[in-house]
Amino acid sequence: MTGLTGDITVGAALPPISKQFTLEMFKSDIATIHNDQAAAEAEGLPGPIAVGPQVAALIFRMAREAFGAGWIEGGKTSLTFRRPIPCDALCTAKGTVTGKKQEGEGTRVTCDVWVETADGEKTIVGTASGLVSGK
């Protein structure tokens, strides 16, 4: 079920989604930049970093909750990863409606979306859109 309808206004905020990442989430039998201090330092990083697609999944979850089936059946994204995220970061996906237009029997709602860390730094930025009922 979708939380948004076609009468959503430009400038409206999507409900944010937060997740506390931990090093344990990225553990495996192989030492990588995502789970091992020495491997991360060997690549010039200060420490292990989160797996980018796993962090971006916060945006996908936020969009699914906002658009419901309109995300599954017609969702679109374009994302840019701006910097590595420490593996122990608290990250929050946020979004703002930037436009809407009629598409078929519904409305395509376009949003600016991003993931930010607890200090407010945007680490992933982009756009997402989905279909909602109504005009």
What residues fall within each predicted segment?
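HotDog/MaoC-like acyl-thioester-processing domains
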Residues: 1-13, 86-135
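Hot-dog-fold acyl-thioester-processing enzymes
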Residues: 1-72
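Short alpha-helix capping/helix-loop boundary micro-motifs
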Residues: 1-2, 76-80
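Residues in well-ordered beta-strands of folded domains
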Residues: 20, 80, 129-131
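Sparse recognition of residues in long alpha-helices and their boundaries
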Residues: 27, 75, 104-105
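Short, surface-exposed, polar/charged, turn-prone segments marking secondary-structure boundaries
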Residues: 35-36, 42-44, 77, 86, ...
